[in-house]
Regions:
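Helix-to-loop junction immediately C-terminal to a conserved catalytic motif
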Residues: 57, 316
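Conserved ABC ATPase signature
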Residues: 145-149, 153, 390-394, 398
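Catalytic Walker B motif of ABC-type/P-loop ATPase nucleotide-binding domains
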Residues: 170-173, 415-418
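The feature captures the beta-strand-to-loop junction immediately N-terminal to the Walker
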Residues: 42-44, 301-303
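Conserved ABC ATPase "signature" region
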Residues: 123-141, 371-386
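H-loop/switch region of ABC-family ATPase nucleotide-binding domains
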Residues: 205-206, 450-451
Length: 496
């Protein structure tokens, strides 16, 4: 059993956060999670959800220092007094960014890492690694270089490394953020299996639809406090308006319909012609031919590892192993030119945040930045209160919004977003969608790698489905295509 008793916590000024009251800080949390319960923690980005998980696994206060009042009890023992090695044997954590918890360069070693630290015999380690891969249906990922994995595949390995250790408590922070629909369905199945085994599960999540028949309780946080503790039945009875007023996303994707466009033919501005992409001389995508016009918002859809991010990197001149040409207005453009005219919001935005403050990041590397545009964009994405904060101190969703802000401010002609809604609540997703629509109206070409159907329906005018190394389908978002698009979006990832 996990118990929070009048728990308040504020990050130390020398720790991850800056001094002063922050929304990530917690105030007077009283919460009991019984053995075998699955509890969903949700709420606006930066409201303290991740901090709660850090208190359970002991990272607060052992790794993240701060002012701690009250108690967190794990089976009756104060977590702050339990040695970290002992807590780690009881509590398994999958972080929001799985890259931050990897210690090895190959997948088998990563899955085995926790078992090795607990001094299991070699034979047992090999058996547990094999069983974890089999149970989680990721045998195809064994023996792989971690750096070659997609974001979704990395999340699967992080989950497997925890599953192999068989903890009694699972802490999952945004576990679906980079997963395709098939993988989300698999995650759903894994969670049901863990529940049947009597495991205790705490899930931090914005994407709620796949958890509605799993979660026993839904805890909504707001500015570091528990706003409401719902039973599953109570939560499902909320209206869309009530849910959205708390910054929460849809519970039923079937209600979402794609944006309908006019479908008018426009002049081709960008054209990949007979393009093939390789990774370490192995073909990823072959013979890609397509035509794109200014103002289009194109969704790149398909299973984890199919090559969506590789195609995005090639579009903006960041991928080396390539055959074929890219044409702009009918003329071949070089890799260097593509780099100049494009900007990419990466799947892991930590790779592209360089400045010492949020405000400085918004104009970092941009010649003659428009001060008014910087201020307007920061305000639109609710980044103004954090203007003097270091980007590294932001929550995952806040970092995502910051990277999107730079995408608007840089005034590039070609903008690529790789999973831009990872870690975003409903309101933040709507704000990013508004930015995307505005950029489209300005004549930019936008490509969005996404598994987020809710976001897709608010932004995209066209969908490219990648499968088996090629463009499997290319559909405009027209009225007559609505149902086909919905089915394709899900079936492209294996879910009906």
């Amino acid at each position: 059993m996990i118990e929070f008793k009048h728990l308040s916590f504020s990050y130390d000024s020398h720790g991850e956060q800056e001094a002063g009251q922050r929304s990530e800080d917690l105030q007077d949390i009283n919460l009991t999670v019984h053995d075998g319960e699955c509890v969903l923690l949700t709420g606006r980005s930066g409201c303290g959800k991740t901090t709660i998980t850090r208190l359970v696994n002991g990272l607060v206060p052992h790794f993240y220092p701060g002012k701690l009042c009250g108690e967190v009890l794990l089976d009756g023992r104060n977590v702050s007094e339990i040695p970290m090695y002992e807590t780690a044997s009881l509590v398994g954590s999958v972080f929001q960014n799985p890259r931050t918890q990897f210690f090895n360069v190959d997948t088998d070693s990563e899955i085995a890492f926790g078992l090795e630290n607990r001094a299991f015999p070699r034979e047992q380690i090999e058996e547990k690694v094999a069983n974890a891969a089999k149970d989680l249906k990721i045998e195809n990922l064994r023996g792989r270089n971690i750096f070659s994995l997609s974001g979704g595949e990395k999340q699967k390995i992080a989950f497997a490394s925890v599953y192999a250790m068989n903890p009694s408590v699972y802490l999952l922070d945004e576990p679906s953020s980079n997963l395709d629909m098939e993988s989300v369905a698999s995650l759903q199945s894994h969670l049901k299996m863990l529940k049947s085994q009597g495991k205790t599960i705490l899930i931090v999540e914005h994407r709620l639809h796949y958890l509605m028949d799993i979660a026993d309780r839904i805890i909504v946080l707001n500015e570091g406090r528990i706003k409401k503790d719902y039973s599953a039945r109570e939560f499902l009875s909320l209206s869309d308006e009530e849910r959205r007023s708390m910054g929460l996303r849809t519970t039923d994707l079937r209600k979402e319909l794609p944006l309908v466009t006019s479908g008018k033919e426009q002049e081709t501005w960008l054209e990949p012609k007979n393009v093939s992409l390789f990774y370490k001389k192995k073909a990823v995508l072959e013979n890609i031919n397509a035509k794109f016009s200014q103002g289009e918002v194109i969704a790149l859809v398909g299973k984890n590892g199919v090559g969506k991010t590789t195609f995005s990197r090639a579009l903006c001149g960041l991928h080396k192993e390539i055959k074929g040409d890219f044409l702009r207005d009918g003329r071949i453009i070089s890799k260097k030119t593509r780099q100049k005219i494009s900007y990419m919001v990466m799947q892991d935005v930590n790779y592209e945040l360089f400045a010492e403050s949020v405000k400085a990041e918004c104009s970092f590397g941009i010649k003659n930045p428009d001060a008014n545009l910087v201020a307007e964009t920061m305000a639109a994405l609710e980044l103004t209160p954090f203007s003097e904060r270091h980007p590294g101190t932001l929550s995952g969703g806040q970092k995502q919004r910051l990277a999107v802000a730079v995408g608007q401010i840089c005034k590039k002609e070609l903008i690529l977003f790789d999973e831009p809604t990872s870690g975003l609540d409903y309101e933040s997703m709507e704000k990013v969608a508004k930015i995307v629509r505005k950029l489209s109206e300005q004549g930019k070409i936008l490509f969005i790698v996404t598994h987020d159907y809710e976001f897709f329906c608010r932004t995209c005018s066209r969908m490219l489905v990648f499968s088996d190394g090629e463009i499997h389908c290319d559909l405009q978002c027209r009225a007559e295509n609505k149902e086909e698009i919905r089915q394709l979006f899900f079936s492209a990832a294996g879910e009906k």
